[in-house]
């Protein structure tokens, strides 16, 4: 095991974040392609709706755990041992994490398969018996994804603790390509838009089995870089002494937040299932666009900073912790506002491009946009609190934010028409995520002091100005170029969406450069430093790139 070189200040974090961002763009483009192919393959069919509902159960668990539970558990437990070069402690902790993960998730997968019918009946409001039966069959095929997700999350955390960032981003790319192939095979067998009755059991199994195969690729491909670390974890339930003291609080935090998010998910799925036939597909598409800028813009910065925050906290280096967190937070705020502006500006063309209800899709995407700010704060601040062991305050904030989603959704879905059911979900999600982000800001200030949030208000103000200006410019452009003889074709809508996104980016960067260039510079500088190094394979002085920065 090679001891990673320590990060040399905020600039190194920005460079690592730029590498992650570049790879994440490719990975998320593949993920977007997967969703686009799925939307075109199933269209507005009842089979597509039941697939979304069934796949949401294990799939959202992955999003939940990867965002804050197991992933947040692994890095803090390993950071100190990795920094100290303690190979034995790293190996023991990794083995214990894998053992506990499989011990908990394998029985859970069995229970999920056994309870597939009642679960789908609970979620599938107003669906026919044939549709519910198809959903239950697919959920049984999806059940093995749970332990596979657990393995992948632990291995991802081990790699990130060693500052190996490349493969955790490459694995989803390979998974998406695998699932795309399954979708194409399905459409070759059943045809586009096939219903439950038309597709038959064989085509249905291609759809569900191919999706689970994608999760196999997602998780087990990470064994390749793990072998390069020369770790040989063995089964066992005992953690190393240093890790043992922290694992309980982190595990409880993960369980509580997962429970809160699952409550929100269950209410969301039931509300969506009670909408129009294609409402689950609209929800799936809108959520994909919502998660795209979050994963490409906010998560890379948070992921790159996480090992530094955990190591600084373990070593008692408060200055490094606060400097790293404040700089990362400012960057995440700016990029989250940029992503929100792009969602608003491009929502209309996106809705017209896909073969679903255009108004419902556009409204849902725009409704998700404000929540991107809170979710971006979640990406960095939850990690910051977990890194310093402040699990109770993190858990309280995250739980309150997620439980606010169904509390807002229930009355909102009753007030809005059935056709706007996904819009109600999007608005409720935004309300909950903004609350979550605000509570995390309060928790971090109490735990680490106001210095950890230095400049956050300035960056938020600049981001808000840039986002409003960029979104208004895009909406003005769309009104200007709108055809007078009806709805534009799908390919015209695609061009309009791309043009809107570019305009939002240009206007946003111009405004932020004028009012807060000091926070924008590190983000842009990190990207400039990283891209030439990756293209040339060498630094400007001729020396090879540093190890431990994600280069495998």
Q: Where would I find each of the regions flagged by the language model?
A:
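Membrane-embedded alpha-helical bundles of multi-pass transporters/translocases
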Residues: 1-552
């Amino acid at each position: 095991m090679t001891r990673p070189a320590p990060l040399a200040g905020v600039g190194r974090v920005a460079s690592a974040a730029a590498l992650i961002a570049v790879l994440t763009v490719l990975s998320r483009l593949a993920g977007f392609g997967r969703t686009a192919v799925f939307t075109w393959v199933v269209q507005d069919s009842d089979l597509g709706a039941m697939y979304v509902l069934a796949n949401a159960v294990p799939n959202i668990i992955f999003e939940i755990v990867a965002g804050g539970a197991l992933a947040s558990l692994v890095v803090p437990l390993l950071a100190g041992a990795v920094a100290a070069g303690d190979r034995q402690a790293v190996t023991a902790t990794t083995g214990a994490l894998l053992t506990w993960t499989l011990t908990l998730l394998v029985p859970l997968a069995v229970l999920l398969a056994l309870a597939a019918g009642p679960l789908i009946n609970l979620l599938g409001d107003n669906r026919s018996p044939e549709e519910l039966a198809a959903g239950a069959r697919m959920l049984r095929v999806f059940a093995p994804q749970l332990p596979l997700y657990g393995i992948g999350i632990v291995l991802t955390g081990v790699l990130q603790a060693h500052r190996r960032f490349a493969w955790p981003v490459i694995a989803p790319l390979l998974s998406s390509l695998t699932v795309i192939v399954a979708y194409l095979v399905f459409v070759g067998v059943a045809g586009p838009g096939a219903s439950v009755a038309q597709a038959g059991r064989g085509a249905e199994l291609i759809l569900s089995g191919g999706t689970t195969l994608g999760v196999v690729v997602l998780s087990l491909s990470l064994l390749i870089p793990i072998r390069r670390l020369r770790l040989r974890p063995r089964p066992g339930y005992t953690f190393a002494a240093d890790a043992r003291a922290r694992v309980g609080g982190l595990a409880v935090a993960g369980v509580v937040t997962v429970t809160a998010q699952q409550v929100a998910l269950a209410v969301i799925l039931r509300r969506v299932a009670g909408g129009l036939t294609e409402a689950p597909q609209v929800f799936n598409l809108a959520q994909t666009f919502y998660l795209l800028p979050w994963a490409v813009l906010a998560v890379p910065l948070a992921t790159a900073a996480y090992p530094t925050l955990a190591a600084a906290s373990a070593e008692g280096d408060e200055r490094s912790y606060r400097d790293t967190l404040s700089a990362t937070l400012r960057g995440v705020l700016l990029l989250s506002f940029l992503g929100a502006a792009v969602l608003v500006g491009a929502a209309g063309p996106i809705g017209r491009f896909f073969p679903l209800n255009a108004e419902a899709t556009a409204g849902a995407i725009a409704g998700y946009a404000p929540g991107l700010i809170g979710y971006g704060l979640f990406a960095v601040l939850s990690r910051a609190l977990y890194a310093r062991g402040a699990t109770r305050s993190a858990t309280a904030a995250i739980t309150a934010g997620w439980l606010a989603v169904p509390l807002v959704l229930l009355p909102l879905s009753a007030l809005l028409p059935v056709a706007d059911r996904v819009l109600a979900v999007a608005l409720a999600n935004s309300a909950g995520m903004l609350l979550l982000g605000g509570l995390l800001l309060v928790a971090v200030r109490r735990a680490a002091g106001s210095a950890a949030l230095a400049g956050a208000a300035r960056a938020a103000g600049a981001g808000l100005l840039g986002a409003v200006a960029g979104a208004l410019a895009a909406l003005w452009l769309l009104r200007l170029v709108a055809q007078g003889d009806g709805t534009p074709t799908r390919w015209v809508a695609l061009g309009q969406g791309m043009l809107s996104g570019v305009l939002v980016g240009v206007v946003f960067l111009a405004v932020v450069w004028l009012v807060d260039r000091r926070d924008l510079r590190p983000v842009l500088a990190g990207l400039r430093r990283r891209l030439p190094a990756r293209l040339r394979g060498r630094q400007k002085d001729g020396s090879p790139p540093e190890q431990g920065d994600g280069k495998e």
